[in-house]
Structures are given as structure tokens and as C-alpha cells.
């Protein structure tokens, strides 16, 4: 079909006229672009406070304050004045629970707040409404701030707020499979936002923006490098570079983690062995953990991929996966660090002619007999399916086979098996099918989500982890 030239010119003119408006919506801002409300939606916020009292001072509280001021300015056209003490009249009060209760002793809390939970409450004070955003910790205050901004964006009334939210699980992390040269394994959104040319990027603006997006979703940790880890990540020079990434994450309450090569004591530590039960290897991991925490006091922990797809592991010395995990976990434990030990362990040279070769049961066969052998800060990181991240895989049987070991479910956000970012794909229904699946353990009603969150068998840690693999593309994921 031929398009008349005049029609083409009209189309081109209209597109050019609309282009400035289209560019005004930054893809980098994603869901945090805070579009101005229309007149009808904005009318209900005529009495919105003009002052925010920030009780306390920290990097995270400063982020909450700046985010609130930014969102209200764009959506409502109001400029909030920030003060450090409770003012007279209508106000927003933002701060940790102890400080807020000292300023507002009449505030009643009917339900217990846990770490990272938050309370949004509207109370009457001096004849006018005060909106309270509070939590046990600063990170919860930040999450409550994002929650209030969501309500404004949706045009929801704020006159009678009474919302207490606690997280379903303590672990809410994302992983990146970024290489030190700036490439990303299974990444479709451009080069790494963390690395280039074998070093941490000079400009970490996008890393900070990513942490902001993560915080708005309640995500509290991010491991930034490929699970097929480069041993150089633990070199003294590189640790100082990683401290810069941690500094970019810190204002948003996101803890930094890194994937490490299990063979590091030998490959870059100068030892003759990486046997996890060798005294020198044990001492090496302890010294390395101490060194990391001197540079990054709030470091989150390690991710380990061992005995899988050519990566070295404890089987080289006849040791178990628990032997390997516990040695590294004990080095991290005095500092509050976690060890995410991937259960993606199998022989990738399986002989298809052997009828007993069964990759789908490999993780269960290896880790189920070790249940109860892992230290408290070891978290087994289990892919949603027994093979990989394949579409429509059943839930991994290992979720139901661990009653005395903490675990997280590893989900794939990056579209390795769902089109590789050539088109959009709504992943939530697939994840929900797995999370809601009842594993029929001896306890009644044990869906995967309750098992990984630690609720089914009263585990201290556990939760959810997604492999994001965002990049420098404006829209992060490349779709």
C-alpha cells in the first residue's frame, strides 16, 4: 500500500510536534517519574501539609526527606518546608519510632512493627491533621515514604490513614551477573552500570538511581557481579572500588553483596589449596572478610556458585557443600554477613546414555541429606525449577526438603528464556504459580512462599531473590 505524500507529511509533522512531550517522560525514572495529578485528583489534596518534620538524621532519612519533597512538588505542585522539630499546625512527621513517640506520645500502635516495616497514620493534633510516617528503623521510614507517595499518585485519600505494613520475609535481594569488563551474562539492557574495563565505573550515577528504584519496592540487597565470579573481585585494590558502590547504595538502604570464586584462596590468595577444611584456607577467608568489613562496614555478604558448570567446589577434596558453605559463613558471621550458597549444583557432563543420570533431582540428592548441617547465616539459593529458570517448570522439590536450613527462591527477571527482551513478558503469573504451590510437607499448607520466607519451619532468615541484569539502556532492561 502506497501512502500519499501529503499524508506522510502530516504524520511527520504530528510526530515532531509530540516529540518534546514524549521526551519529557524519562525511561530511567521508570515508575518513579511522579507525573502531575490532573485537576480533579489534585483537588482532594488542597489541605496537604506544607511542612515535613524529619525527626533524626541519617543518610536514609535524608533520602526519605528529599524523595518526599520531590514527589510532592511534581505531583501536587507544592513545595514542602523541611524542619527538624515538630511544628504547630498541619504537618508530616517522618522518623524512627522512638523519636516519633517522644514527639507524639498520643500515637497508638495496635500491631507490632518488625524490621523494615512501616506505619502510616493520620492523627489529629491542635485541631488539624498530622500525617505520620514511622518505623522501627530508618529503612522502614524510607519504605513508608514511598508508600505515601504511591497513595498520592493513585489519588487515594489521606484523611484517615491507618496502615501498618511488615515485610513478608527479611531477605529481598536482586543479583546482577555483571562481568568486570562491563559485559553482562544474560543481560539485554546494555553494558554494566557497575563495571567497565576491569574496574568499577567512574560514574556511578546509574547505580544510585538503581538503588532508588530498588528501595521503592522494598528490596534491601544487591549482589553486583556474575556468579561465575572473577577472583579479582576480592583483591585489596578492588575492595576500595567496591566501597564506592556501597556508598551509592547506602542512602537507599540497599546492602552490597558480591559473588566470589570458591577457589579464591588458591587463585588469588597464594595458597596451595582451597580445601575448606584446611586451616590456612579457613584463616584466609576470615582475614578476607575482616578486610572487606573494614572497607565496607555494612557489607551484605557473598554469593557462591560451586561444583557447577565448571566452577570449582568442595568435591575437589571430598568435602560436602555444607563444609564449604560453613567455612565462608563463619568468616562473615561476626560482622553480620550472609552467605548465599547456590543449590544449582549438577554435573554438566552427564552421560545421556546412563538412565540413572537425572539433572532434575541433582540439587535434592545433594542438599536434602545435608539439611540441618548449615550454619544459621547460610542461605541456600534455590532456582524456582529443578532444571533452571525454564518456562512452566514445576517447583523445585528441594523447597520442601529443607526443614532445618534457611533458603531463598531465585527467580529470573532478565528474559533469558522469555524472549531475551525482544518483547515484553509479564513474569508475575509464572512466579505466583510457583510461590503458591503447596509442597505438602508434614506440616499443613506449606506453599513455596512460606517455606522460603522461613515461616513454615521457623527459620531466622529467608526470602526472595531476583536476577535482574539491568544495564545502561535508558529503560534498564532493554525491552
What do these predicted ranges mean?
Residues 1-6:
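Positively charged n-region of N-terminal signal peptides that target proteins for export
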Residues 8-19:
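Bacterial N-terminal signal peptides
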Residues 22-126:
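Acidic, contiguous N-terminal accessory segments
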Residues 45-46, 86, 124-127, 166-168, ...:
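Extracellular/periplasmic catalytic domains that process cell-envelope and extracellular macromolecules
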Residues 57-67, 71, 107-303, 333, ...:
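Feature activates predominantly on carbohydrate-active enzymes
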Residues 160, 294, 312, 319-479:
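Substrate-binding groove of N-acetylhexosamine-processing glycoside hydrolases
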Residues 176-178, 226, 258-262, 306, ...:
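A cross-domain feature marking catalytic cores of carbohydrate-active enzymes
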Residues 230-231, 266-275, 305-316, 346-355:
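Active-site-proximal beta-alpha loop/turn segments in soluble metabolic enzymes
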Amino acid at each position: 500500500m502506497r501512502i500519499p505524500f501529503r499524508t506522510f507529511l502530516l504524520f511527520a509533522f504530528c510526530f515532531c510536534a509530540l516529540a518534546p512531550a514524549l521526551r519529557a517522560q524519562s525511561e530511567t525514572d521508570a515508575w518513579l517519574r511522579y507525573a502531575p495529578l490532573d485537576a480533579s485528583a489534585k483537588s482532594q489534596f488542597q489541605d496537604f501539609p506544607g511542612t515535613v518534620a524529619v525527626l533524626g538524621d541519617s543518610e536514609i532519612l535524608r533520602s526519605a526527606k528529599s524523595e518526599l519533597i520531590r514527589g510532592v512538588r511534581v505531583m501536587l505542585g507544592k513545595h514542602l518546608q523541611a524542619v527538624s522539630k515538630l511544628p504547630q499546625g498541619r504537618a508530616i512527621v517522618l522518623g524512627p519510632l522512638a523519636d516519633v513517640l517522644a514527639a507524639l506520645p498520643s500515637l497508638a500502635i495496635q500491631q507490632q512493627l518488625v524490621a523494615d516495616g512501616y506505619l502510616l497514620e493520620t492523627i489529629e493534633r491542635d485541631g488539624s491533621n498530622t500525617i505520620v510516617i514511622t518505623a522501627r528503623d530508618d529503612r522502614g521510614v524510607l519504605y513508608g515514604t514511598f508508600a505515601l507517595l504511591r497513595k498520592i499518585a493513585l489519588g487515594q485519600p489521606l484523611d484517615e490513614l491507618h496502615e501498618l505494613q511488615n515485610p513478608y520475609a527479611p531477605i529481598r535481594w536482586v543479583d546482577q551477573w555483571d562481568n568486570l569488563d562491563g559485559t553482562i551474562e544474560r543481560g539485554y539492557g546494555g553494558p554494566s552500570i557497575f563495571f567497565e574495563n576491569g574496574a568499577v565505573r567512574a560514574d556511578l550515577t546509574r547505580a544510585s538511581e538503581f538503588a532508588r528504584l530498588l528501595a521503592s519496592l522494598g528490596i534491601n540487597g544487591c549482589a553486583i557481579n556474575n556468579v561465575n565470579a572473577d577472583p579479582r573481585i576480592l583483591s585489596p585494590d578492588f575492595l576500595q572500588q567496591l566501597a564506592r558502590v556501597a556508598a551509592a547504595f547506602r542512602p537507599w538502604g540497599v546492602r552490597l553483596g558480591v559473588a566470589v570464586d570458591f577457589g579464591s584462596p588458591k587463585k588469588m590468595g597464594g595458597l596451595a589449596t582451597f580445601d575448606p577444611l584446611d586451616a590456612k584456607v579457613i584463616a584466609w577467608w576470615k582475614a578476607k572478610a575482616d578486610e572487606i568489613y573494614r572497607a565496607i562496614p555494612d557489607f551484605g555478604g557473598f554469593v557462591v556458585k560451586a561444583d557447577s558448570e565448571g566452577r570449582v567446589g568442595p568435591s575437589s577434596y571430598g568435602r560436602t557443600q555444607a563444609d564449604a558453605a560453613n567455612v565462608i559463613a563463619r568468616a562473615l558471621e561476626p560482622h553480620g554477613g550472609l552467605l548465599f550458597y547456590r543449590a544449582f549444583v549438577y554435573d554438566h557432563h552427564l552421560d545421556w546414555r546412563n538412565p540413572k543420570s537425572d539433572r532434575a533431582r541433582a540439587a535434592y540428592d545433594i542438599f536434602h541429606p545435608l539439611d540441618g548441617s548449615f550454619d544459621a547465616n547460610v542461605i541456600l539459593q534455590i532456582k524456582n525449577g529443578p532444571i533452571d529458570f525454564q518456562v512452566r517448570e514445576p517447583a523445585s522439590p528441594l523447597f520442601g526438603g529443607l526443614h532445618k536450613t534457611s533458603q531463598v527462591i531465585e527467580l529470573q527477571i532478565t528474559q533469558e528464556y522469555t524472549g531475551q527482551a525482544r518483547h515484553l513478558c509479564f513474569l508475575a503469573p509464572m512466579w505466583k504459580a510457583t510461590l503458591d504451590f503447596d509442597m505438602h510437607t508434614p506440616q499443613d499448607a506449606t506453599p513455596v512462599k512460606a517455606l522460603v520466607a522461613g515461616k513454615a519451619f521457623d527459620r531466622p532468615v529467608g526470602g526472595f531473590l531476583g536476577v535482574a541484569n539491568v544495564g545502561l539502556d535508558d529503560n534498564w532492561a532493554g525491552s
